[in-house]
């Protein structure tokens, strides 16, 4: 939604595809496999990905006022009812319900004073420093179980903050 140019959008899309296995795909695979279930990911089909990446990036920019515009247009007609097709995008974690995410944020806020947050986040300044109390909460859980393994996590899976207007700060997304 924030790409300043079509070329920047295409480059970011290529980067996301290259790194996808480290983020949502890995998380989904581990959660599903631990329950002896196999996932099918239709939008992960290689032919589909190649097709989408070959579309003119200018057409993929969010100049229509709605994210995922081309995907929504593809399912217009008899495929999906308009109230589903054109509803607001939701973060991956929203499927668990807003109340749970809000509860986690509230809990994380209660764990640390602002001063404690600044001091404790500084422990991780060398790599992927937490940027909210919630992200510090997640990081400390990670460190408890995977001590000194943070280098395996390349970066936060967040929108490109170098782009103008992009001030998303939600580790739950």
Task: Pin down the residues of each PLM region.
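Adenosyl-5′-phosphate
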Residues: 4-173
